[in-house]
Amino acid sequence: MYVTPALLFLSAYLILPTLETVYLSFFDGRSRNFVGLKNYVFAFTDHTMLVAFRNNLLWLVLVTGISVSLGLIIAVLVDKVRYEAIAKSIIFLPMAISFVGASVIWKFVYAYRPAGAEQIGLLNAIVTSLGFAPVGWLVERSVNNFALIAIMIWLYTGFCMVILSAAVKGIPADVIEAARIDGANSWQIFWRITIPMIRSTLLVVSTTMVILVLKVFDIVFVMTGGNQGTEVIASLMIKEMFNYRNFGRGSTIAVILLLLIVPVMITNIRRFKAQEKLR
């Protein structure tokens, strides 16, 4: 009885739109003619879609791996040092900036002008001062995806650090002290005590980052608009749905994105329930 309003709200604003999206994915661009699996065949054979899948995989590996690794390293290194609060505040600060705001900031960092012209972009100013030619960080296909990925790493390393820092501080001091008495060095303590004892938190942070990366859109949209081979699944979905007005293909891409995210969410929920039972 008490959860009925919440269930009604969930049905109206989550379940019904999801079912409608799945339904539209089996129709043509105008949602008039049933086309079966044609849109799904398109999604897994179209060159642009395959590029988007490849880019999302690249984001998934690099952003998740580097953000979590850096967050863990920083959490361990600054633990219990005098300037811990200041260091953590500075590293966490980018989290206060929206994706769009961060993209605008980094546009100035990556700004490019032809060789011989004064460089207003911070990165190209450094490059040219060292005697090299300026680089079109957002237009050269060999580097533009990595340039975009760096933005999200900058944004979310602080998030990973804060969560993992709390887990590191939760390790009993007597366990660490006993290990030191037994002759364990810092490296052994890190791999044999710290990592095993915060493994559940590491998994939660990693899966959370996976979900965030799969949904990435703002950075790509603001920085490149998905051009020059930087398309990702979410940006392609927006283009098909709103730019090209192809509701069938747009819905299909949305369903695929949902199918990629839901298993990760379910894994997180199950892990949370398992931890609750242990408490």
UniProtKB/Swiss-Prot annotation:
Entry's induction text: Expression is very low in cells grown in basal medium but increases significantly after a salt shock.
Membrane topology: Multi-pass membrane protein
The keyword Ligase belongs to this UniProt entry's keyword annotation: no
Record-level GO cellular component terms: plasma membrane
Any Gene Ontology biological process: transmembrane transport
Organism domain of life: Bacteria
Domain ABC transmembrane type-1: residue ranges: 53-270
Main location: membrane
Sequence similarity: Belongs to the binding-protein-dependent transport system permease family.
Assembly notes: The complex is composed of two ATP-binding proteins (GgtA), two transmembrane proteins (GgtC and GgtD) and a solute-binding protein (GgtB).
Its biological purpose: Part of the ABC transporter complex GgtABCD involved in the uptake of the osmoprotective compounds glucosylglycerol (GG), sucrose and trehalose. Responsible for the translocation of the substrate across the membrane.
Name this protein carries in UniProt: Osmoprotective compounds uptake permease protein GgtC
Source organism: Synechocystis sp. (strain ATCC 27184 / PCC 6803 / Kazusa)
